[in-house]
């Protein structure tokens, strides 16, 4: 537990003090956010607000995770390193995207194909990494089985190992792409993505720490409901560090935001959710835990699909939070209400995880 507390405090301290330093640097060099002309008109006043705040979130998380893991004697573990690779790798792609937007003063950053290629490369290396380097108990970071609160009977290796690995690569890429897009779309209002993420990673802190104390490697573990997740304590420390970094960043990102996380932060957060869902073997449960993110991305998919099919719009504007803006809701009202919904959903997801464990006792 001391490792989690240390990681949280260190990350929050680094983030809350490092963010204003980054703000001054970005303002000095006039690295501000470009605002789309076709968005809500009230967003035009945000033009020029410093972006790429995700840099501080990433750095604070990585440093605090390393210190927390060393304090707890939990790592750096192979699972933790894989999660950091996915987290930082997608953050770098986002940083390139943000940089191009700023330099060229347009809403389009990296070409979509370039961004997809980058995501595929990072996600594929992560996926392959989860299938190697078992620990002394024979536990791998990943599994070919589709998982809910633990691996299910449905496995991607049904037609042999070779095809199973190929399907696993595709499945992992789908998970990573879906979550990174979901968090990116949610990052549209001051403090929204950061606040929602705190609740999601709060739920995953509980899940990973519970997997630690109920690990099959623990003395006297019940084989009926213990967990074979590899390095759960290290993953819990990462979650605690990320929550601390987000809390510190939110101090400056709350409305009216003095800085945005940008694609740098949004893609990294999506990578963290995806990575945790795979490494904790909760791929489908993550849909519940991160249900607010899912609702936002579904609103965008529904809007586009219905408009292409019928020429009509379901929402006044997508993603979902912009719909409520055009209904006349204040930005702060939307953000706080979405936070409340995200908190309830995240707690429900953690509750489902615990209920599944209880059902096996």
What residue spans do the PLM features occupy?
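Flexible loop linkers connecting adjacent transmembrane helices
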Residues: 25-43, 100-108, 319
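Membrane-interfacial helix-loop-helix junctions in multi-pass membrane proteins
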Residues: 153-160, 328-333
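Membrane interface segments of multi-pass transport proteins and intramembrane proteases
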Residues: 101-111, 148-158
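Juxtamembrane helix-capping/reentrant segments at transmembrane boundaries
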Residues: 36-50, 105-118, 326
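Alpha-helical transmembrane segments
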Residues: 1-27, 57-95, 99, 126-147, ...
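Short loop/hinge segments at the start of secondary-structure elements
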Residues: 93, 108, 117-129
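Short, amphipathic alpha-helical segments
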Residues: 83, 104-115, 138-140, 161-164
């Amino acid at each position: 537990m001391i490792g989690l507390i240390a990681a949280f405090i260190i990350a929050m301290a680094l983030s809350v003090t490092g963010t204003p330093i980054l703000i001054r640097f970005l303002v000095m060099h006039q690295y501000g956010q470009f605002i789309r002309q076709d968005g809500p008109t009230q967003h035009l006043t945000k033009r020029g607000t410093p972006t790429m705040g995700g840099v501080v979130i990433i750095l604070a998380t990585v440093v605090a995770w390393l210190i927390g893991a060393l304090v707890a004697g939990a790592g750096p573990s192979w699972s933790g390193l894989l999660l950091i690779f996915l987290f930082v790798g997608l953050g770098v792609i986002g940083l390139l995207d943000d940089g191009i937007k700023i330099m060229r003063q347009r809403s389009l950053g990296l070409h979509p194909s370039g961004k997809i290629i980058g995501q595929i490369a990072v996600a594929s290396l992560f996926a392959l990494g989860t299938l190697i380097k078992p620990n002394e108990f024979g536990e791998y970071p990943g599994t070919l089985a589709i998982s809910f609160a633990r691996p299910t009977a449905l496995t991607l290796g049904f037609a042999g190992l070779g095809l199973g690995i190929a399907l696993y690569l595709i499945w992992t890429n789908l998970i990573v792409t879906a979550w990174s897009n979901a968090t990116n779309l949610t990052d549209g209002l001051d403090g929204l993505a950061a606040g929602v993420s705190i609740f999601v990673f709060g739920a995953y802190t509980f899940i990973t720490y519970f997997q630690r104390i109920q690990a099959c490697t623990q003395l006297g573990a019940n084989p009926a409901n213990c967990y074979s997740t590899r390095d759960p304590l290290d993953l819990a420390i990462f979650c605690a560090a990320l929550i601390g970094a987000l809390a510190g960043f939110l101090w400056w990102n709350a409305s009216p935001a003095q800085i945005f996380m940008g694609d740098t932060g949004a893609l990294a957060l999506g990578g963290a959710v995806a990575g945790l869902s795979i490494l904790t073997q909760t791929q489908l449960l993550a849909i519940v835990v991160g249900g607010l993110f899912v609702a936002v991305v579904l609103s965008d998919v529904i809007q586009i699909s219905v408009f292409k099919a019928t020429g009509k719009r379901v929402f006044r504007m997508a993603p979902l939070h912009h719909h409520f803006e055009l209904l006349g809701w204040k930005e702060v009202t939307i953000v706080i209400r979405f936070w409340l919904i995200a908190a309830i959903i995240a707690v429900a997801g953690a509750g489902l995880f615990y209920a599944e464990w209880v059902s096996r006792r």
